[in-house]
UniProtKB/Swiss-Prot annotation:
Binds ATP/ADP in vitro. Possesses low ATPase activity but high affinity for microtubules. Keywords: ATP-binding, Coiled coil, Microtubule, Motor protein, Nucleotide-binding. ATP binds at residues 120-127. GO terms for molecular function: ATP binding; ATP hydrolysis activity; microtubule binding; microtubule motor activity. Disulfide bonds: none annotated. Binds microtubules. One of its GO terms (biological process) is microtubule-based movement. This is Kinesin-like protein KIN-7F. SUPFAM superfamilies: P-loop containing nucleoside triphosphate hydrolases.
Length: 945
């Protein structure tokens, strides 16, 4: 006999009155519930009325009983008590049964053990109450059996009494004491106990009458017919299906219900007992005292010793007291003032009993008939497989193939949805910029850009669709200055057909929102003076980027366009497009042959030769500095106020208007202010630079780090400072290999110029990108055995804000290199870089968290934590089990969130809101890099591993 889940139990119908009889045992674990406690107040007896004994207890509602006067010897004792149900003196036994015992008693028909107790002082109405409840319960059981003829029921009845700590069989004529035995499967049972199979309801009535006659009773001063023993009536019900209806309905349910009528506690001074009555009262009070001790210890939820074996009563009723049974206790009491102390003790017992938790399970037995049928069915299936193995294997392979197709289609559907959402967001951005005017961009017409002239004294507005070639022109015109506002021209209806039209693939076309800017009055002359001097320098820089994006011909064409637009000394005062000059230029281009065009481009390129040499020497001399080294053309422009403003803007985070600037082309992002590299720096590899950084970090950590454990944890400010330093180190490494590695990928974005601005370009895409990067980082953490404290800090700090992209990128690249390092084995120059050493450090950190659980969490909080993390309260080393569960399920984001929350609580981390507010004050723009001490990296060593 064992416990099964509720899905394997036959779901029977509801009883009359809407009571559900299915106990719904929750699988092998069972269903935890408290004991149902009720209090019944009897009316005053004739003797009490004759003595003028007033009533001191009153039921104010269905759940509360109060005392009308206080206890003189105990002024602090409570005067009000609350229970599951309180019955007034005018309530009949049928109402007590329906509201206080029916639901528990009828659980027996669904395979759940149940017990009904009657507890109270002598002459309080226990036997009267239990007699009625027994009759009502048996009547409902037989009524249920009559309504369910599809199952076969077998009822067995047994009865015992405990008189002076001696167990007797009430159904046997012999007065022989019975012995108690313990069995691993049955539990405690009575040896040679008579068990009668019931024929019907009348047969049970006859047996109950025999028990009443056999039970020990006697007359006392308080009661003419007082019970002198504890009586236990046991009704066992076995039910099984009459025919085989399937595997789920082929089990046999076995459960029993106990009707326990306890003898009443009494005082010798009040009962005036002597001789045999005094001896009986001593045994009764002793067994009831043991019962009260067991109830009190069970109510305190402690793992101490429970004295079940101190009394035969508690030993027999052990399954009903906090075991595999549903239990209801009905406490009877007298309202008379003379019994006030005894009534208060009864209420205290009831208060402890309602705190006791039981674990009721469904008891089932697999029938032989059902087991045979199940084995026959399994045998037939195996024989069919042996007869035709080919067909079975082909069917299995077909099912696997279909499953693979389904998974593949689901993956494709997910990718298509992402592409659709991305396309919709891009379309919305384009519609907002373009409005009602549709701008068609043609790459062949891009040469008309040299007809643009600077509007020196006025504000210029230009709306254009930026292509790869126009990006180069923009780079030349901006002279590599970051943060330049893109000028736009708003198209008016009368100017629509005069505008220059470009056509380019849509994936390269990004529109810019309108922005107005002012140029100094001498800007046109100044530009014309420096264009001839340093134009070769500019063309060199343009071709370095454009070679990998558009090819050599497009680069030459774009460079020619940019240089012509700068070299024109006779530019007009306003920035506009001249129809006449435009048409004449187009006709002139049509007339020229390809050879003429190539010669023209070659003539444009020749004047730049000298400036390239200056640029190379300048960049080599400034390779060790942290600030961008400029060519002579750029230095000649820095004296103006415009470029001073640009320098200020470049060293600070973008303002709000620039953050919202979503129309900047992806290949024309604002560049970092430290883009300098020479020929020697190109030899530096990414692995080498990062390896040197880790070496330096470990040297600092050896001198300053302390063992993680009992020391205090770093503050959130220090952790943010660590991330800031990591971002600066990552930026320097990007500069080291930007000359040969990243530019070869074909986009300026790969150089890592401004990932924050890039993430802000499409807000609808950033959440998906953030989730992807976050999942990759979590996987890397798990693979590299990164410190749990580092994971918690990082996870709680960055929650999807677009400004967090630089942090995510730095962490992702660091972890990627760390994983590559581990996969290649330990490095000789850096100790403790193997995966085994990092695993040992992670294990020590988990042990440290175990100690923190003991210090920072109370007993109740720890027990709640064990339950939440699925750790059994009865198991050993529970704190270590919880620590080993932390950050283990990398694919379950809820598990990760709960792990971070628990670790943050254990290490005393600040609120996430405060941490984020401090993070927002940081600026990751490249600045003078001074290596700070590593005192704050107390746990950084674990994070690197």
């Amino acid at each position: 006999m064992g416990a099964i889940g509720g899905d394997e139990v036959v779901q029977w119908d509801k009883m009359d009155g809407g009571e559900v009889v299915n106990g719904g045992g929750g699988g092998g674990v069972g269903k935890l519930e408290r004991i149902l406690v009720s209090v019944r107040l009897r009316p005053l007896s004739d003797k009490e009325i004759a003595r003028g004994d007033p009533s001191e207890w009153e039921c104010i509602n269905d759940t509360t009983i109060i005392s009308r006067s206080t206890f003189p010897d105990r002024p602090s004792a409570p005067t009000a008590y609350s229970f599951d149900r309180v019955f007034r003196s005018d309530c009949d036994t049928n109402e007590v049964y329906k509201q206080g015992a029916k639901e528990v008693a009828l659980s027996v028909v669904s395979g759940i053990n149940s017990s009904i107790f009657a507890y109270g002082q002598t002459s309080s109405g226990k036997t009267y109450t239990m007699t009625g409840i027994t009759e009502y319960t048996v009547a409902d059981i037989y009524d249920y059996i009559g309504k369910h003829e599809e199952r076969a029921f077998v009822l067995k009845f047994s009865a015992i009494e405990i008189y002076n700590e001696v167990v007797r069989d009430l159904l046997s004529a012999e007065n022989t004491p019975l012995r108690l035995w313990d069995d691993a499967e049955k539990g405690t049972y009575v040896e040679n106990l008579t068990e009668v199979v019931l024929r019907d309801w009348n047969h049970l009535k006859e047996l109950i009458s025999v028990c009443e006659a056999q039970r020990k009773t006697g007359e006392t001063y308080l009661n003419e017919n007082s019970s002198r023993s504890h009586q236990i009536l046991k009704l066992t019900i076995e039910s099984s299906a009459r025919e085989f209806l399937g595997k789920d309905k082929s089990t046999t349910l076995v459960a029993s219900v106990n009707f326990v009528d306890l003898a009443g506690s009494e005082r010798a001074s009040q009962a005036l007992s002597a001789g045999a009555r005094l001896k009986e009262g001593c045994h009764i009070n002793r067994s009831l005292l043991t019962l009260g001790t067991v109830i009190r210890k069970l109510s305190k939820v402690r793992n101490g010793h429970i004295p079940y074996r101190d009394s035969k009563l508690t030993r027999i009723l052990q399954p009903s007291l906090g075991g595999n049974a549903r239990t209801a206790i009905i406490c009877t009491m007298s309202p008379a003032r003379s019994h006030m102390e005894q009534s208060r003790n009864t209420l205290l017992f009831a208060s402890c009993a309602k705190e006791v938790v039981t674990n009721a399970q469904v008891n089932v037995v697999m029938s032989d008939k059902a087991l045979v049928k199940q084995l026959q069915k399994e045998l037939a299936r195996l024989e069919s497989e042996l007869r035709c193995p080919a067909s079975y294997s082909s069917l299995e392979s077909l099912v696997k193939e279909k499953d693979n197709q389904i998974r593949k289609m689901e993956k494709e559907i997910k990718e298509l949805k992402l592409q659709r959402d991305l396309a919709q967001s891009r379309l919305q951005d384009l519609l907002q910029v373009v409005g009602d005017n549709h701008v068609h961009v043609s790459k062949q017409s891009s040469v008309s850009g040299r007809n643009f002239t600077f509007d020196v004294p006025q504000t210029c507005e230009d709306e254009q669709s930026t292509t790869e070639s126009s990006e180069v022109v923009d780079s030349v015109q901006n002279f590599r200055f970051q943060g330049r506002r893109v000028a736009q021209r708003e198209h008016k209806p009368q100017q629509a057909e005069n505008n220059v039209q470009f056509t380019t693939p849509s994936r390269y076309s990004v529109s810019s929102p309108p922005f107005s800017g002012m140029l100094p009055t001498n800007r046109s002359d100044h530009l014309s003076q420096i264009s001839n001097e340093d134009s070769d320098d500019i063309c060199k820089e343009v071709r370095c980027i454009e070679t990998n994006e558009t090819g050599g011909n497009e680069c030459l064409e774009s460079s020619a366009v940019g240089s012509n637009s700068l070299q024109d000394p006779n530019a007009g005062s306003s920035m506009h497009i001249n129809n006449d000059s435009n048409s004449s230029m187009n006709s002139r281009l049509r007339d020229e042959s390809p050879v003429t065009l190539e010669q023209h481009l070659e003539n444009v390129r020749k004047p730049f030769a000298n400036i390239v040499k200056d640029l190379g020497s300048s960049t080599r001399n400034s390779s060790s500095s942290k600030v961008l080294g400029r060519s002579r053309s750029c230095r000649s422009l820095t004296g103006s106020s415009l470029f001073e403003d640009l320098e200020k803007d470049d060293c600070t985070p973008p303002n709000r208007s620039f953050i919202d600037f979503a129309g900047r082309p992806q290949n024309c992002q604002r560049r970092g202010s430290a883009l300098n590299y020479d020929a020697e720096s190109e030899t530096l590899s990414r692995a080498g630079s990062m390896l040197s950084e880790i070496t330096t970090t470990r040297d600092g950590l050896k001198a300053n780090s302390s063992v993680a454990g009992d020391t205090e944890f770093t503050g959130i400010g220090e952790f943010v400072a660590e991330l800031k330093e990591m971002a600066q180190v990552q930026y320097q490494k990007q500069l080291g290999h930007s000359g040969n590695g990243d530019l070869a990928e074909g986009t300026i974005r790969s150089v890592g110029l401004d990932p924050i601005t890039d993430a802000l370009q499409s807000p609808s895409r950033w959440p998906l990108e953030f989730e992807k990067k976050q999942q990759e980082i979590i996987d890397f953490w798990h693979a590299c055995n990164v410190s749990l404290v580092h994971r918690t800090y990082f996870f709680l700090l960055f929650k999807g804000d677009p400004a967090d992209s630089i942090y995510m990128e730095v962490e992702l690249r660091r972890l990627s290199f760390l994983k590559d390092t581990y996969s290649n084995g330990a490095i000789a120059s850096i100790p403790n870089t193997s995966l085994v050493s990092s695993a040992k450090k992670l294990q020590r950190e988990r042990e440290m968290l175990c100690r923190q659980m003991q210090r920072r969490l109370s007993i109740e909080e720890r027990e709640s934590m064990y339950t939440k993390w699925g750790v059994s309260l009865a198991s050993k080393r529970r704190r270590l089990q919880v620590a080993r569960c932390l950050w283990t399920e990398t694919k379950d984001l809820e598990h990760v969130r709960e792990s971070a929350s628990l670790v943050a609580r254990l290490i005393g981390l600040l609120e996430p809101g405060k941490a984020l507010r401090e993070m927002f004050g940081l600026s990751f723009a490249p600045q003078q890099f001074t290596r700070r001490s590593y005192n704050s990296w107390r746990y950084g060593r674990s994070s690197l591993n």
